[in-house]
């Protein structure tokens, strides 16, 4: 018992500096934001009432949720395919998959966003090639809209969806899959009826991680959306630095943080923190 308490005390002492940093760097400033949401420009609940009546704010919230949902579905599906190859493929396939997973981390989000602008713009590589081969006569609108935002965000978030899936797949007992095959199940049926259900915790974890990250995206929607597909993080920036309407911007921030906090609590009901690494 003493050894157990000693270990717990040692762990608490090691975590104390980090917890202090989090309180000073995040919790304390956030309390200031909460205060602004109730006091600027006048004390009261006026800013939160505005969230329920301002059609612009409501449309941005809906757009953010819609884009986040689409990005989550596409990212998890793509990440699942990549993870299957990474975990259960041949050595060469694993190297290629690992390369695809790690390379995006070497490039900044700003560089990637401008790279997609170069690819998707009217005179970009994709439109130029499609016109050259005769598939289209006029350039397609692939950027400065929701499509461009979804492409850029999906490209950024796929690697983050891989790790919970990989942890879930590595924990599978191959004997269960062999038993299914031995009972006459085809490869495809074994995959959909046995393999996929057994990795459901990884799917849920990946989906929640991607969805939470999507809600707070700023740089990618600002560049690829071109001001036409404003998401909630960009709206907060505009309200605080351009309007300026600090009270409403603070209220939107508080609602976003509480919503993300609820999603994170839901996340850790389905996946252990160690599964994320």
Regions from the language model: what does each represent?
Residues 1-6:
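Short, Lys/Arg-rich, polar N-terminal cytosolic tail immediately upstream
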Residues 183-184, 197:
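Glycine/proline-centered hinge or cleavage motifs at structural transition points of membrane proteins
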Residues 172-176:
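Active-site loop immediately N-terminal to the catalytic Tyr-X3-Lys motif
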Residues 270-277:
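Short cytosolic juxtamembrane segments of multi-pass membrane proteins
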Residues 180:
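The alpha-helix within a helix-turn-helix
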Residues 42-53, 227-239:
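Short hydrophobic, aromatic-rich alpha-helical segments embedded in or entering the lipid bilayer
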Residues 7-41, 55-170, 194-198, 202-218, ...:
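Membrane-water interface segments at the C-terminal ends of transmembrane alpha-helices
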């Amino acid at each position: 018992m003493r050894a157990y308490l000693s270990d717990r005390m040692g762990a608490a002492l090691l975590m104390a500096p980090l917890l202090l940093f989090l309180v000073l760097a995040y919790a304390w400033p956030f309390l200031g934001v909460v205060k602004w949401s109730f006091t600027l420009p006048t004390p009261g609940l006026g800013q939160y009432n505005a969230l329920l009546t301002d059609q612009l704010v409501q449309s941005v919230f809906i757009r953010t949720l819609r884009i986040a949902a689409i990005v989550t579905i596409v990212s998890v599906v793509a990440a699942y395919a990549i993870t299957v190859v990474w975990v259960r493929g041949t050595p060469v396939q694993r190297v290629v998959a690992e390369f695809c997973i790690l390379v995006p981390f070497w490039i900044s989000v700003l560089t990637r966003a401008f790279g997609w602008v170069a690819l998707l713009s009217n005179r970009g590589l994709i439109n130029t090639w499609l016109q050259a081969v005769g598939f289209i006569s006029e350039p397609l609108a692939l950027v400065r809209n929701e499509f461009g935002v979804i492409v850029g965000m999906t490209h950024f978030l796929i690697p983050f969806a891989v790790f919970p899936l990989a942890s879930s797949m590595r924990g599978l007992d191959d004997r269960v899959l062999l038993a299914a095959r031995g009972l006459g199940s085809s490869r495809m049926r074994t995959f959909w009826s046995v393999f996929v259900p057994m990795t459901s915790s990884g799917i849920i974890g990946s989906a929640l991680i991607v969805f939470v990250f999507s809600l707070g995206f700023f740089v990618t929607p600002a560049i690829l959306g071109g001001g036409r597909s404003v998401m909630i993080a960009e709206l907060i920036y505009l309200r605080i630095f351009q309007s300026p309407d600090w009270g409403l911007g603070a209220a939107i921030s508080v609602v976003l943080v509480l919503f993300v906090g609820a999603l994170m609590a839901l996340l850790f009901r389905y996946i252990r923190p160690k599964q994320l690494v």
